[in-house]
UniProtKB/Swiss-Prot annotation:
This is Ervatamin-A. E64 binds at residue 14. The active site is at residues 14, 146, 162. Laticifer. It comes from Tabernaemontana divaricata (Crepe jasmine). Disulfide bonds join 11-52, 45-85, 103-182. Its main location: secreted.
Amino acid sequence: AVIPLKNQGKCGSCWAFSTVTTVESINQIRTGNLISLSEQQLVDCSKKNHGCKGGYFDRAYQYIIANGGIDTEANYPYKAFQGPCRAAKKVVRIDGCKGVPQCNENALKNAVASQPSVVAIDASSKQFQHYKSGIFTGPCGTKLNHGVVIVGYGKDYWIVRNSWGRHWGEQGYTRMKRVGGCGL
């Protein structure tokens, strides 16, 4: 289960949205509670990342672990710009994170079968940016520059959740060709 789609706006915070989506989902799987968590807290407080200028999933997870948790979206709402880090509740905790070997489709498929998984893709092509529907087959390269979440898969494609709002793609999702598409 995932929270309704969100939109990162003009802030380069895909790393925070992708990380938070997986933590929300893992929390729902473990507790049965689907709670919208704060991307803004990561943008403001994950100092090893770069706020709206980009970041890394592993550093975001490490922030959540070291901080003892992350607050809700309601308590620490998204602003689409980096502000000062402020005190926040620790509503949902994680105790670790595990990577999936790059370019290993079976490992990724096994991970996605048990929970949504964050991945970096090459989203620089105009075709991806203006994607509307169908199985996205490219063109795209392997310059990993955008964080998304794989929430499922079909025979020939991954079901990928983006953070560009419901107007993009298939209600904010895309189906991406499996077998090495866009850096996967």
